[in-house]
């Protein structure tokens, strides 16, 4: 999967020009840029180190955000964030780890990438930047729903948050061979599966967390989607059903 953004570690101070402004980058600061901007700058390898982050990692980061930010529209133009004083020893260790052949665990790599993104979590522009880096409309819709699975979602809610029209979203989703109702159902069923695998949450609570006011309707929907009831699913090891 292609990368959608990059984290840059500055190794010596220098200036860049962005949107008709000069920006002074200090030694040991880090930047987060969208893919196109990172490619446009073509930083010198003597001045910087670069870590490219894939879209799946961005989606995993956003999936753990449970509070829907207000500034989350396509109107946001932020493409560059700077952390002038990150925990440099940790940052350096993370960058070094990707050159260490002993670090070959996909799970560990994922956690290191997420750690890099979290170093910009104090920036209110982080979520819009990551959200806008998602390449598909269906991916954006899925991420919006994931912020609050229990919400009674309508297409107009998505259009409002993406600062566009319902008809345009419908058309783009059709171009991607999907639709809003399919994405909503898949998101709810994915959440239901994860909660059932915990085996510690009452069924009516799982139904509510997945946006269903009726437990019986949730059970029927789950059975139609996975081919088994929630009870049958919870009796098997995680990953048995697809």
Curated annotation (Swiss-Prot):
Taken from the record, one Pfam family name reads HTH_18
The entry's keywords:
Activator, DNA-binding, Repressor, Transcription, Transcription regulation
Please indicate which superkingdom the organism of origin belongs to. Answer: Bacteria
Q: Which InterPro entries is this protein grouped with?
A: Homeodomain-like_sf (IPR009057), HTH_AraC (IPR018060), HTH_AraC-typ_CS (IPR018062), Tscrpt_reg_AraC-type_HTH (IPR020449)
The residues that make up the annotated DNA-binding region are 156-177, 203-226
Keyword Repressor in annotation: yes
Q: What induces it?
A: Expression can be repressed by GadX, depending on the conditions.
A GO cellular component annotated for this chain's UniProt record is: cytosol
What GO molecular function annotations does the UniProt record carry, in alphabetical order? DNA-binding transcription factor activity; transcription cis-regulatory region binding
> Where in the numbering of this chain does the HTH araC/xylS-type domain appear?
139-236
- Biological role: Depending on the conditions (growth phase and medium), acts as a positive or negative regulator of gadA and gadBC. Repression occurs directly or via the repression of the expression of gadX. Activation occurs directly by the binding of GadW to the gadA and gadBC promoters.
How would you summarize the oligomeric state and partners of this protein? Answer: Homodimer.
Q: Give the protein's recorded name.
A: HTH-type transcriptional regulator GadW
Which organism's genome codes for this protein? Escherichia coli O6:H1 (strain CFT073 / ATCC 700928 / UPEC)
């Amino acid at each position: 999967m292609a990368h959608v953004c990059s984290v840059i570690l500055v190794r010596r101070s220098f200036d860049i020009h962005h949107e008709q402004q000069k920006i002074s980058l200090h030694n040991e600061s880090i930047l987060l840029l969208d893919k196109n901007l990172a490619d446009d700058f073509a930083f010198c390898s003597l001045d910087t180190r670069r870590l490219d982050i894939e879209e799946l990692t961005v989606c995993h980061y956003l999936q753990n955000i449970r509070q829907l930010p207000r500034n989350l529209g396509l109107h946001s133009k932020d493409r560059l964030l700077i952390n002038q004083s990150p925990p440099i020893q940790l940052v350096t260790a993370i960058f070094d780890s990707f050159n260490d052949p002993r670090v070959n665990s996909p799970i560990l790599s994922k956690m290191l990438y997420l750690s890099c993104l979290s170093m910009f979590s104090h920036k209110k522009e982080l979520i819009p930047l990551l959200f806008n880096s998602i390449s598909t409309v269906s991916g954006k819709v899925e991420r919006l729903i994931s912020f609050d699975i229990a919400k009674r979602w309508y297409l107009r809610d998505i259009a409002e948050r993406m600062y566009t029209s319902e008809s345009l979203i419908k058309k783009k989703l059709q171009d991607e061979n999907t639709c809003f109702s399919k994405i909503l159902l898949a998101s709810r069923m994915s959440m239901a599966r994860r909660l059932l695998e915990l085996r510690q949450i009452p069924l009516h609570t799982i139904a509510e967390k997945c946006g269903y006011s009726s437990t019986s309707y949730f059970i029927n929907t789950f059975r139609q989607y996975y081919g088994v009831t929630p009870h049958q699913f919870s009796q098997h090891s995680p990953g048995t059903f697809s």
